[in-house]
Design a protein with these regions (language model features):
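N-terminal lobe/hinge region of extracytoplasmic solute-binding protein
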Residues: 5-53, 84, 145
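Structural transition elements
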Residues: 236, 269-308, 326-332
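Gly/Pro-rich hinge or "lid" segments in bacterial periplasmic/extracellular proteins
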Residues: 41, 124-174, 178, 188, ...
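Aromatic- and charge-enriched surface segment that lines or borders ligand/interaction sites
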Residues: 48-90, 110, 239
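Surface-exposed binding/hinge segments that line
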Residues: 51, 93-134, 154-156
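Periplasmic-binding protein-like
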Residues: 213, 240-278, 289-298
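A bilobed periplasmic-binding-protein/Venus flytrap-type ligand-binding module shared by bacterial periplasmic
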Residues: 164-169, 224-248, 252, 261, ...
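Ligand-site clamp/hinge motif
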Residues: 166-212
Length: 332
């Protein structure tokens, strides 16, 4: 048995409800046609091969001998129905895949898109497209019928998810007999749960708590693809409408120091995108560099000058901006 601490549960376990499906893949209950490896490569899951036949046609060969958690065989027709159900229930998902039609051809699924969509495979790895038995939706909000190595046996919103090994899993016998997943959203409480051995593993070790786990623990660092960014309000009412102000801000930020403080050494000081996960980062020219003198020069040329309060001002109005961040994550 293993106890796991996650930093977030969805409101439900319905794969089509908002972003709730992410919990299903994290706990080993749900699977998609393909998935992504830690080094960002596509690998087969419920489809064992695929082909982009032409700009608007994709062919997926559906893995044989797969069963849903209720014992029903997973057929290409079942996969078709699952994808179509997801598109019907989730406008966000339908918009991402741009699917015009899905047809069954033997063990293959033929997907036609409304336009060339090179990112279709990537979109189908999104947890919203976990394959489920849509003929068995009576408990979809708490016990969706999926295909993963672990079967959901109970769900208590905001508390726990209980799972049991699925004996008929296509990938062989799961490594654990059972798993308890706990919803521990507070970073400090999650860290304390691991320290006290209330859980065996936690997701998302807050940077401020990394030092607690130097001895006797194994922290795995992986290059992420999530980008936390500040978006500028370009409307005329905002001082950021002025390109000079935006440029000055880009030059005044000390990226390395900010990364060291916020990421506690685990986050690279880079902008505008993380170098570890974005193709083409190294080719970006004129990356913003910390240069306070340059920022001062830019603002001066734009008509700003320091007033008696030491604040930059223009036409008698001090330069001031308001920053709003997502307040749920205290690590930010």
């Amino acid at each position: 048995h293993m106890n796991v601490g996650l930093y977030w549960f969805g409101e439900t376990l319905d794969p089509t409800h908002e972003w709730d499906a992410w919990t299903l893949t994290r706990i080993g209950a749900g699977e998609t046609l393909a998935t992504v490896t830690p080094d960002m490569k596509f690998t087969p899951q419920l489809a064992d091969s695929w082909e982009n036949v032409d700009p608007t046609t994709w062919k997926f060969h559906i893995r044989e001998n797969v069963k849903f958690h209720n014992g029903t065989p997973m057929t290409p027709q079942k996969v078709k129905e699952s994808i179509e159900y997801t598109m019907k229930q989730s406008a966000r998902s339908a918009k991402a895949v741009k699917i015009e039609s899905i047809a069954v051809d033997g063990q293959n699924l033929i997907i036609k898109t409304t336009e060339p969509n090179g990112s279709l495979l990537s979109s189908l790895t999104e947890p919203a497209f976990v394959i489920m038995d849509t003929a068995d939706l009576k408990d979809v909000a708490s016990k969706p019928v999926l295909t993963g190595p672990y079967k959901i046996t109970s769900f208590k919103k905001g508390e726990t998810i209980e799972l049991a090994a699925f004996a008929d899993y296509w990938g062989g016998k799961p490594g654990l007999d059972s798993v308890t997943v706990k919803d521990i959203e507070d970073n400090n409480k999650r860290a304390m749960a691991l320290q006290s051995k209330d859980v065996d593993v936690i997701q998302k070790v807050d940077s401020a708590n990394r030092s607690l786990f130097k001895d006797g623990f194994n922290i795995q660092d992986v290059a992420g693809v999530r980008v936390f960014m500040l978006k500028a309000n370009h409307t005329e009412a905002s001082p950021l409408h002025d390109k000079a102000v935006r440029s000055a801000i880009a030059h005044i930020i000390n990226y390395d120091s900010m990364a060291k403080i916020i990421g506690n050494g685990s986050t690279p000081g880079a902008a505008p995108f993380p170098p570890s996960a974005n193709l083409g980062y190294d080719a970006i020219a004129n990356k913003p560099m910390t240069d306070v003198a340059k920022a001062d020069q830019i603002l001066t040329q734009a008509g700003y000058a320091k007033n008696a309060n030491g604040m930059y001002a223009k036409d008698g109005k001090e330069l001031a901006i308001t920053i709003a961040i997502w307040g749920k994550d205290t690590s930010l």
